[in-house]
Amino acid sequence: MAPRKKKQAAEAARVSAADLHVKGLKSEVQEQPITDTLKYNYMPYAMSVIVSRAIPEIDGFKPSHRKLLYTMYQMHLLGGARTKSANIVGATMKLNPHGDAAIYDTMVRLSKGYGALLHPFVDSKGNFGKVYSRDMAWAASRYTEARLDGICVEMFRDIDQNTVDFVDNYDGKLKEPSLLPTTFPNILVSANKGIAVGMASDICGFNLGEVCDTTIALMENPNHDILSTLLAPDLPTGGELLYDEKILRSIYETGRGTFKVRAKWRYIPKQNVIEIYEIPYSTTTEAIVDKVVELVKLGKLKEISDIRDETDLSGLKLAIDLKRGNAPEKTMQKLFRLTPLLDSQSCNFNVLINGQPRVMGVRE
């Protein structure tokens, strides 16, 4: 090889070697059994999602919920005037580094305006959307305001009396509570849903008064029949629960199961219109309208001439115009059979206990 070509080859080898050690990284192929790869790469990620994001803990909150509410508590928003949501989001980033959009989404879900909880923790002002609407966008954080709702007094009671442990935040500069010292079983009152890696959690809410009565009854008598005081799940969007004692008792004992909920409706004779004013928690007004329109086009719902979403500030309302000669009761039975106006609500009471996921019955 000519001297010039040798020099060029050596230079190319030097550049290639430099590329392989950029910032101390060395390019190489490692042979590793797939079981070891899963153990050292996949499992840490999976556990991070389970423990730090998706599954609620025994106080009824996910880490993102707890960080937001504690930040608002530190901002003295438990009572007094509201502040801009953007201000709260910015302050929360000191504890939650996931970005402003994720934090604001969390605030929306916990808000009174959104309506996803029986007892919301955020007293909101402005457009926070609605849980029963798929397409209703909430306003940007710079336009809305919020403060803690009155029920949060029970979330933070005696938090400064060593009732819970405090841990470092992500950069070790601040402290945050590992749990909130709730004075009632919030895990059963606030609906919660999360999808992790290889597991999920779907906890339906229950009536606060019934939960407290049942808790007191269990303290007085450990053998108390829970179903006699905790009658059934209570859903924020209302609807009628199709009661089945055997199914509910199984859900209460095992923490798993499914029950059915259907919409509430009324008939307006003068207008020959069916009005839907409560729908199952698991669906949306848009999904219902889309399904009805699809069935009408396919010729499977010939009794209906039109459907409109007339939801306004007074509440949810879907108006269904009937053709003459069609009985509203029979039409509704058909709608329940063919559309999400009758839907299933799944239960999977998967909760983190000391960092370990565990499916628990209501008694536990």
Q: Across the structure, where does each feature detected by a protein language model lie?
A:
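Catalytic phosphate-handling regions of large nucleic-acid enzymes and associated NTPases
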Residues: A2-G255, K317-A319
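Charged, surface-exposed alpha-helical interface/stalk elements
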Residues: I226-K246, E253-E364
